[in-house]
């Protein structure tokens, strides 16, 4: 069985992420969406919330499993799951340069593990989780940029934060 992992912080999952997951799920018999930690990011959603949201987004996809591995290296997760590939999404050349460097580190740690790069649609190439959070923070509508469960969770999170500030 061909298996791959799609690791990320997914804070929150965007339509670009979902597009890459769906494309990868057509390429591999089993795809693990892995909720991980990026120590350089400030999170809006905690690990459990990110896991629950991802599970909702992909609940109808039979060959996609969502798991959390916040304290492990990507290569270790791939080994644990017997995955032969790491899937990453690309929006632009900046992403390519970053992912090339990460793929180099992963290849050094495990020469047999491949990285598969998938491009998002041009109309989704500007979407980033950081941009989504910034837009929501200032009251913007992002419902066309994220899956429905994510849009609802963002709205609720913002409402709760606004109520706490009052």
Swiss-Prot record:
**CDD domains per the UniProt record, alphabetical:** PPAT
What is the organism of origin for this protein?
A: Lactobacillus gasseri (strain ATCC 33323 / DSM 20243 / BCRC 14619 / CIP 102991 / JCM 1131 / KCTC 3163 / NCIMB 11718 / NCTC 13722 / AM63)
Record's keyword terms, sorted: ATP-binding, Coenzyme A biosynthesis, Cytoplasm, Magnesium, Nucleotide-binding, Nucleotidyltransferase, Transferase
Stated family: Belongs to the bacterial CoaD family.
Q: Where in the cell is it found?
A: Cytoplasm
Q: Which NCBIfam families match?
A: coaD_prev_kdtB (TIGR01510), cyt_tran_rel (TIGR00125)
Q: What does this protein do?
A: Reversibly transfers an adenylyl group from ATP to 4'-phosphopantetheine, yielding dephospho-CoA (dPCoA) and pyrophosphate.
Q: Which Pfam families match?
A: CTP_transf_like (PF01467)
**Under the GO molecular function aspect, what terms does this record hold?**
ATP binding; pantetheine-phosphate adenylyltransferase activity
Upper lineage:
Bacteria, Bacillati, Bacillota, Bacilli, Lactobacillales
Is the keyword Lipid metabolism assigned to this protein? Answer: no
Subunit text: Homohexamer.
Electron transport as a keyword of this entry, yes or no, is no
**Site annotation Transition state stabilizer: residues:** 17
Q: Which InterPro entries match?
A: Cyt_trans-like, PPAT, Rossmann-like_a/b/a_fold
Record: residues binding ATP: 9-10, 17, 89-91, 99, 124-130
UniProt record, GO biological process: coenzyme A biosynthetic process
- Entry protein name: Phosphopantetheine adenylyltransferase
The coenzyme or cofactor needed here is: Mg(2+)
Catalytic activity, reaction form = (R)-4'-phosphopantetheine + ATP + H(+) = 3'-dephospho-CoA + diphosphate
| UniProt pathway annotation | Cofactor biosynthesis; coenzyme A biosynthesis; CoA from (R)-pantothenate: step 4/5
Binding-site residues, substrate: 9, 41, 74, 88
Question: Which EC number(s) does UniProt give?
Answer: 2.7.7.3
